[in-house]
């Protein structure tokens, strides 16, 4: 009966190894459990399950071929997964690496190179094949995601968050400075406090904000709102986008404002409001579609050959106020 029970049990549990005593599973910690060839559980309450699995700290859990959990209360789950920080979690298998041309990365012997899932700092979490969380409190979720800043979060395949408390969400998104946020595929926030939202959006100045498909805010405190909008000057604001084949708004001088598709403000402290409006000179204002302000300290509501009237103008009362036609007619009548 004992032989029959033993035979039945082995039908549902098998572990292959050398079977010569050289790769026995070893559990040396109190209440530790080791299962699999060369599995090792050393800490109190440690659990190592899988060939070559190592659980080397109190309450550590390693599950999978060559999985390693060396931090207290750490969890490594997956082939080659590594959880080395206290309270760290690494869940995922290995991921084959490819170069920028899509060719497999090979070692010196011509063998493919694989990246393991790794959580190497206290309270770090790595989820996904080849994901890496390498600083305290960092979270990397997605195949190849990498969170290397303290308390940073990288969510998405190959997303990267390298600044302290940086956040990157989306395929190959990147947040590379402290407090930076990038949300959207290929989005990038590369300076302190920068925020990029949208596919391919880029925020590269301190406190810059880019919102929209391909929007770019590339200088200090600049703001670009709309698809492909560009704000490239300090404190600049570009509002209004354009899709492929059309002209986006662009605020390129310091402290300018460009609003509407194709609005352009290269002048310092200039404002362009309207489709294709241009404020070229410093402190100039262009109002209306195709308006051009090309002299300093002026306001333009049209352009040469495309002039506009200004209507509903109240009578001027101060020396620098505009004078309307009624006032001029009154002067003409009085002089007769």
Q: What are the language-model segments listed below?
A:
Residues 1-320, 326-333:
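Glycine- and small/polar-enriched repetitive beta-structure motifs of secreted/surface proteins
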């Amino acid at each position: 009966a004992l032989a029959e029970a033993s035979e039945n049990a082995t039908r549902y549990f098998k572990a292959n190894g050398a079977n010569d005593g050289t790769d026995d599973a070893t559990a040396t910690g109190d209440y530790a459990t080791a299962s699999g060839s060369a599995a090792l559980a050393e800490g109190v309450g440690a659990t190592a399950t899988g060939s070559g699995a190592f659980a080397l700290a109190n309450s550590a859990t390693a599950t999978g071929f060559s999985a390693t959990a060396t931090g207290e209360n750490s969890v490594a789950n997956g082939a080659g997964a590594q959880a080395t920080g206290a309270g760290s979690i690494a869940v995922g298998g290995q991921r084959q690496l490819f170069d920028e041309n899509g060719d497999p990365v090979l070692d010196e012997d011509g063998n493919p190179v694989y990246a393991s899932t790794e959580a190497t700092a206290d309270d770090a979490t790595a989820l996904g094949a080849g994901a890496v969380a390498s600083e305290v409190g960092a979270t990397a979720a997605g195949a190849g995601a990498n969170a290397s800043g303290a308390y940073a979060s990288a969510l998405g395949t190959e997303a990267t968050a390298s600044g302290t408390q940086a956040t990157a969400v989306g395929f190959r998104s990147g947040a590379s400075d402290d407090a930076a946020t990038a949300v959207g595929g290929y989005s990038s926030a590369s300076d302190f406090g920068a925020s990029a939202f949208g596919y391919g959006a880029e925020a590269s100045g301190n406190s810059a904000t880019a919102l929209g498909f391909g929007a770019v805010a590339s200088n200090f405190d600049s703001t670009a709102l709309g698809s492909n909008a560009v704000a490239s000057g300090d404190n600049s604001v570009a509002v209004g986008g354009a899709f492929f084949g059309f002209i986006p708004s662009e605020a390129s001088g310091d402290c300018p404002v460009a609003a509407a598709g194709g609005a352009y403000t290269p002048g310092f402290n200039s404002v362009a409001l309207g489709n294709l409006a241009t404020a070229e000179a410093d402190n100039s204002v262009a109002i209306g579609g195709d308006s051009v302000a090309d002299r300093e300290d002026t306001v333009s509501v049209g352009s040469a050959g495309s002039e506009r009237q200004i209507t509903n103008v109240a009578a001027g009362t101060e020396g620098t106020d505009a004078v309307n036609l009624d006032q001029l007619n009154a002067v003409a009548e009085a002089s007769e």
